[in-house]
Amino acid sequence: PQYVASLIQEVRRGTSKPIICYPNTGESYNPATKTWFGSPLPFRAYVRTWYEAGARVIGGCCRATPADTHDIAEFRAELIREGVPPAL
């Protein structure tokens, strides 16, 4: 999650199409032991940054939890309250 905003900004330089953001939680997978390691990073701290960087469809991939989905939905509700027509 911590690298997504800069990646979105890079993609925006090359397209005017809507950008989809579907990150994982920042953990790493060890295929030898078939285990995940590292601490998951909560989406709550990043969703607004991703949106402000240019993402218009935001979801979650590997290891994203119902709490992460809730955080995305809460941010969408904030945008609606602010009068911004979200595309999330």
Role assignments for model-derived ranges:
Residues 1-88:
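Domain-level signal for soluble alpha/beta catalytic cores
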